[in-house]
Amino acid sequence: MRLLLSIAGLTTVVNALAVRADGNVTSSTAVATPTAWTGFPVPTEYTLPQDDHDFQERKEEIKLKRDTITYVPSIIGETSLFIGGSVGTQIVRQEQAKWIQDLTPVQQDAFREGNASLKAIQDHGGLKTLEDYKILYDGHWSGSVPGGIAQGQFNNFTSDLLFAMERLSTNPYVVRRLNPESDKIPFSVDANNVTHLTGTTLDTLFKSGSLFLADHSYQAEYTAQDGRYSAACQALFFLDQRSGQFLPLAIKTNVGSDLVYTPLDDPNDWLLAKIMYNVNDFFHGQIYHLANSHAVAEIVNLAAIRTLSSRHPVFGLLQRLMFQAYAIRATGEIALFNPGGLFDQSFAFSNVYARKFATDFYPTVAGPFQANYFEEDLRARGLLNASYGPELPHLPFHEDGHKIINAIRTFIGTFVDTVYESDKVLAEDSELQAWIAEANGPAKVINFPSAPLNTRKQLAEILTHMAWLTGVSHHVLNQGEPFTTSGVLPLHPASLYAPVPTAKGGIKDLLPWLPNEQKSVEQISLLARFNRPKIVENNETLLHMFDVKTLLSGTGEAVKAANEQFMIAMGTISKEISTRKFDDQGLSQGMPFIWTGMDPGVIPFYLSV
């Protein structure tokens, strides 16, 4: 039995860079601030600059931070600037030390469980059928991912409804409704097949706003690693008026013979087409989350660090949200996206193309701040309140997300109104206005609200989006989700292991395209290490996002009360999500699997991985 040696090296690599000068690790219950490094005390009460009796000391602190916490070039692609400078580097090392401390028990479990999983499939005689992939999961991974894979994910992996509904749940950031007034049908599909599948024509679906596109054709520009293969799929989906379901219509590979597959093809051909799409989608989800959550939240916060005193209440809130944030990209650069590293070991495309994706998508799709507000993004893609097509029967991402973000908005609204009794007070806050100017200036935040900021509503929107990015959006694509849903084998491999077919028909066995026993366990174990099961017992879940003494004690009774209400709301949402069951049609939220990826009682409040 070959050991999973790729797991063992990560701790050594990260520890080499994650040593604090004093050897200590900051407790997760504190609001980490740079004040420990600048020599200024952590505040016990937050004040606005216009109300501070020692304004000069605030100015000195900010000047020191601006001198010692600087912008340096982006890492892992050309996205946002990273944190540097003498103090900035120490912040990164401190956060890496805490991050590796949290990783270590998960990594140890994953190493042990991975070897047990590999032995189990080898004792079985290897992977001989698609059903054998279940052996890799059954009875394993309870330490690293206690909840296991999502109920229904494996038993229904051939389901077209499952494949389609994943576009509205486990990776909801790609699909969009085609607008008959501004879009074109991206590729043709055999007319007889369309009629058979939909009861109507492709043009009628398009003109009625019932046709949807998920497009990964840009990946045709990428070159797969030796022995790895990938298509660059586009997939069409439609609203079926007969069943009331959101279903797949066709998948186009955009490579080689550029075949177009439909559900009417031979079952193995069609299942392979869905697998090929998922290879593209899996790559997208993992790198999109990096450019959309990490890169965006980091740079907005870095601008705040350089302009807000540690006594500023907004600074205190941001530092809670950004717990451990600067550990992730720095660690990923050396241990995940390094040449031959963990990413290269599993995915079809190397780290070179991960960086290219981040570089290409950050300025256009992933990085714009206001355009990615929760509902704004869904509306822009025609998934919510579309005027040019029928309502989706189910949109699980929004069904859960709108409840969570409304609770976040309520807390943030109280926080902002407590800090600023009027828009006038906000307008007169010199540090806050400097932050907005810095974000639009040296920090180069894309699509950030312009300076000056005039209303409390605008600030509440900014802070709500920051909380959404760090505590919710990130975990839809990362954290435990790839293990439980979006990376479950055999439907979701990180790479193909045989060339994309040049013709349809004649496929008797899909195993040549799928990872073997060793590569399968490597993929599963990598995803297991993304999870953080200890956060529940450590009170680091979304439910506890604002529940930290230093923040609440320094901002007043109204904010404390708002946190209590927030925790009650999160508890209610968590109970609803965690107790989901299938209905009498075998569905949950219109899907043949139970999705719990946004459970506030399980996901972290921060950018965990």
Curated annotation (Swiss-Prot):
Keyword field contains tRNA-binding: no
Example GO BP: lipid oxidation
EC class: oxidoreductase
The keyword Calcium is annotated on this UniProt entry: no
Main location: secreted
UniProt-listed Pfam families: Lipoxygenase
UniProt-listed Enzyme Commission number(s): 1.13.11.-, 1.13.11.45, 1.13.11.58
Entry comment on modification after translation: N- and O-glycosylated.
Cofactor, how bound (note): Three His residues, the carboxyl oxygen of the C-terminal Ile or Val residue, and a fifth residue, usually Asn, ligate the metal, which binds water to form a catalytic base Mn(2+)OH(2) for hydrogen abstraction.
GO terms under cellular component: extracellular region
Gene3D superfamilies: 3.10.450.60, Lipoxygenase-1, Domain 5
Keywords: Dioxygenase, Glycoprotein, Manganese, Metal-binding, Oxidoreductase, Secreted, Signal
Obligatory cofactor(s): Mn(2+)
Location of this chain's protein in the cell: Secreted
Binding site for Mn(2+): H289, H294, H474, N478, V609
Record-annotated Lipoxygenase domain positions: 117-609
InterPro entries according to UniProt: LipOase, LipOase_C, LipOase_C_sf
Family in the record: Belongs to the lipoxygenase family. Manganese lipoxygenase subfamily.
Function (record text): Lipoxygenase that metabolizes linoleic and alpha-linolenic acids to 9-, 11- and 13-hydroperoxy fatty acids. Oxidizes linoleic acid to mainly 9S- and 13R-HPODE and alpha-linolenic acid to 11R-HPOTrE.
PANTHER family to which the protein is assigned, alphabetical: LIPOXYGENASE
Protein name, per record: Manganese lipoxygenase
Annotated source species: Colletotrichum gloeosporioides (strain Cg-14)
Phylogenetic classification of the source organism: Eukaryota, Fungi, Dikarya, Ascomycota, Pezizomycotina
